[in-house]
Amino acid sequence: MKVYNRDSDIEWVSMNFQVPVNAILREYNTIKDSLNIQRPEYDHKDWYAVTLYGYGSDKTKSHWEYRQRGVKPFLTEIGEKCLGTVKWVRSLPYARIDDIRFLVIKPRGYISKHIDVPEHNWLDPLNISLTYPEGSKFILNDKEVPYKAGASIVLNVHYEHYVENNSDEERIHLVVHGKKNKDFWLQASDIPSAINITQETMA
């Protein structure tokens, strides 16, 4: 089994986490009217987000863009309505959670080509697919990321990437930033496109 870490020279790593897709989507459906337009200053189309844990439900950019001395991330009012989702994320092998967000591309929407953090060439966000309608596409460094509903993949967004939703349904992902503990990478998959979906409710 290949051993990964934050500095591994690779675009993404698929993880073997058991994702309670249906249970998370049930909670998402109770708060979907609270979505905010994501990064309206750029040339994206119908990209939305809401924060469950971070610096405010409408503070939907990456956590480091809001970080201030003496201010810690917190469970937002939206997170209070998605306690099962937050509890599941906290069960993952993280030493610290920095943010938890739903990122949604509406039908026929897209995220334009961009690089998140050019100076940080490392594997960072855990990007979990909850729905991935036919016609969806995630291209990272000119390679298509093997997403399907239930896939949990750590991405290196130092590379240029773009996302398309060429369907009539929402594309819904859950994104987590945080400090991974020593056991995190033990959950990496040997199979790049491995998918694990559980229909169980969240414990």
Segments predicted by a language model, with ranges:
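A short hydrophobic beta-strand segment most commonly corresponding to one strand
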Residues: 124-130, 152-154, 169-186
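Non-heme Fe(II)/2-oxoglutarate
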Residues: 1-92
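Conserved short histidine dyad/triad with adjacent acidic residue
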Residues: 101-120
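Catalytic phosphate/metal-binding cores of nucleic-acid and nucleotide-processing enzymes, i.e., regions
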Residues: 1, 7-10, 146-148, 182-199
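Short, conserved beta-strand element in jelly-roll/cupin
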Residues: 104, 119-135
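Extracellular carbohydrate recognition and processing domains
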Residues: 146-149, 153-158
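Short beta-strand His + acidic residue motifs that chelate non-heme Fe in jelly-roll/DSBH
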Residues: 112-114, 136-139, 155-168, 175
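A short beta-strand-loop-beta hairpin characteristic of the jelly-roll/cupin
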Residues: 129-148
